[in-house]
Amino acid sequence: MRKYLYSENGFTEKAEWQPNCWVNVECPDNDDFKFLTEELKVPESFLEDIADVDERPRTETEDNWLLTILRIPMQSNQRGVPFITVPIGIITNDGIIVSVCYHHTELIPDFIQHTRRKNIVVNNKLDLILRIIYSSAVWFLKYLKQINNDVATAEKELEKSIRN
């Protein structure tokens, strides 16, 4: 799924791509892949790196392109593993900003809503990258709080069972 977002008192979605917009691609399909590689000329190697579930956070440059890979938290559907991290790639050059994640997460939609609620204007690609890193940190803390609550509950239950 591909969205074109423009920063005007928060991100607003538009119908088509224009220079200096943010293209957010979530769970890309063949049409998205074709758009990114053929129309925007995004290096295929970047998209392949982002698809690797074990990819580590890093930056890489190729020609005029910059790839920034982050690991963002998301809820897991695996039993006994409440949360996992997945890679998201932010690919930029002079007039193009693209984020690609091969998983549906709550982070990006929440980030977009936050910019709208607070009327945040993102002026450049580095500002966007830093704000996404900050948003990721907020989600890590949110999930850590849930884990701490689960641990506290388990400790109370264990203490109670030991007394009986």
Residue ranges, per PLM feature:
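Peripheral, non-transmembrane regulatory/ligand-interaction domains of membrane transport proteins
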Residues: 1-164
